[in-house]
Amino acid sequence: MAAISSPPLTQKALKVASPDTLHLVTDAPLPTLGQDDSVLIRVVCVAINPVDGKSAEMSPTPGATSGTDFAGIVVALHGDAKSRTETADTIKTGDRVMGFVFGNNPHVLGNGAFAEYVTLPRRFLWRVPDHMSLEAAASLPVGVASVGMALHYLRISMSSLLKAVSRSIAAPSASQPHDGAFDSDANVFILVYGGGTSTGAIAIQILKAAGFHPITCCSSESASRAKRLGAVATFDYQSATCGRDIRDYTNDSLTLAIDCLSESASMAICYEAMGSAGGRYVSLDPFPVRGCVRRSIVPDWICSFTQFGQSIPWAPPYNLDERPDDHRLAEEWYHLAQKLLDAELIEAPTLEIRSGGLLHVPEGVAAVKLGQIKRRKLVYHISEEALP
């Protein structure tokens, strides 16, 4: 292992103590660099996601470090990773990076974002572009990874996506329709239910960059931002005719939907909006089986932790076997997403930045769980050392 400085032997970390309870430990060991391309990062900022509170309540692993989204500074590399630092695409010590980690992980108790140090394989990290702050960077990883996984489950080809995104980067002002990145004759509309959520907003931007025509269901308060980010049309989810209006707008041709809320009401609107030919529906959480009211629509749901190539031994329905195809897809997606980030084609959500470090992060986890954080992402400073 090579390092630009000697990390301490112990660190502060938020550990799962019991259901719905996180406890600050001041003498936790640092996570180990256990893989050939693993990287040790000093955490500067973390963002709060619903899964942080949900997993600690639903499937707590006592002693496991909590937290998913982070941004920070690379301080050490595994020896094999160091040998590849001559290539331009390889992360080096001192680089600003962002990523998300499988917190509350029964397989690896000592690695989570809510800590002073975290480790991840190089292939699951993004460099933070020069134009982006670490606070903004911390707000993006779970969302960006989830969108990539959702596109994969919609059967959209990563190679075709890469070609479309490359064209957008080369000619950002040009409006170029998509030309067949999925295995059907469906048109270019894709419905994003929840365009006002962080992940929904990211999905809209990525779909636009890939040449699709994203449409979204969101609140009236979120509609203007969704359009600015690239939605060609917005629909108020509170309207009794929302699903029918989308179906009319798309001329009965909608075949693909991403549901960022994964509730009975959101699923019902997505199903009503889909054209008579059916299609694919992907939710970001387990969907209610009773909502599967049309045989022509193939439903599925994602759990982005499957990208790490491990089983997920949480309580049902999150007890998932290893999914090698998700792991392979994620490596391709991270490469593509870095291009989007570098080209400034993904804008961070509105941020609420709080200080207080790890000691106050549980307050933020509770606030997100209670639904008190609307249309913004909650970010905490963990280390002030690397901030300007």
Curated annotation (Swiss-Prot):
Record keywords, A-Z: NADP, Nucleotide-binding, Oxidoreductase
Pfam assignment, any one: ADH_N
Matching Gene3D superfamilies: Medium-chain alcohol dehydrogenases, catalytic domain, NAD(P)-binding Rossmann-like Domain
Binding site for substrate: 142-149, 304-308
InterPro entries: ADH-like_C, ADH-like_N, GroES-like_sf, NAD(P)-bd_dom_sf, PKS_ER, Trans-enoyl_RdTase-like
Enzyme Commission number: 1.-.-.-
Assembly, per entry: Monomer.
Binding site for NADP(+): 51-54, 219-222, 237, 284-285, 373-374
Inducers of expression: Expression is positively regulated by the cluster-specific transcription factor tenR and is induced during cocultures with the natural competitor fungus Metarhizium robertsii.
Class of this enzyme: oxidoreductase
Source organism of the structure: Beauveria bassiana
The protein's name in its UniProt record: Trans-enoyl reductase tenC
Domain of life: Eukaryota
